[in-house]
A protein has these predicted regions:
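ATP-binding N-terminal substructure of ATP-dependent carboxylate-amine bond-forming enzymes
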Residues: 1-99, 103-104, 108-110, 114, ...
């Protein structure tokens, strides 16, 4: 069996930015250190090299240096309307394969009015 270099990409709750006026549940969709550590250990137990990387701007420098064969992406992102699509966009620019939905699917899913227009165009109920 081929040994892969896998990068687990996630946004940890503990590292999430805090700002005045944020909702109490602002970062409920982010991951715990326990979850990410268990994922990394599960991949390593399969005989693969695996490293966790926080899904933020540091990826721009870290990913090319690590030379991952594939990224296990569970990033939610921190900023912007299409925050969930940001890391996949970076991975596509770097030409690194990744798990999960592609950029367009994520961006559309987060843009409810555009999603409704597309569904309406195809005569699908919303």
């Amino acid at each position: 069996m081929k040994k892969f270099k896998v990068a687990v990409l996630a946004n940890l709750k503990v590292n999430a930015p805090k700002f005045e006026g944020m909702f109490e549940d602002q970062w409920d969709d982010l991951d715990s250190e326990k979850t990410v550590n268990e994922m990394v250990e599960a991949i390593r137990s399969g005989g693969h090299d695996c490293e966790f990387m926080e899904g933020n701007l540091t990826l721009v420098e870290k990913l090319p240096k690590y030379k991952a064969d594939i990224c296990f992406n569970i990033c939610e992102g921190y900023y912007g309307d299409s925050r969930e699509a940001q890391v996949p966009a970076l991975l596509e620019m770097l030409r690194i394969p990744y798990t999960g939905s592609r950029v367009l699917a994520l961006a559309l899913a987060l843009d409810k009015p555009m999603t409704k227009r597309i569904l309406h165009w195809h005569s699908l109920p919303t």
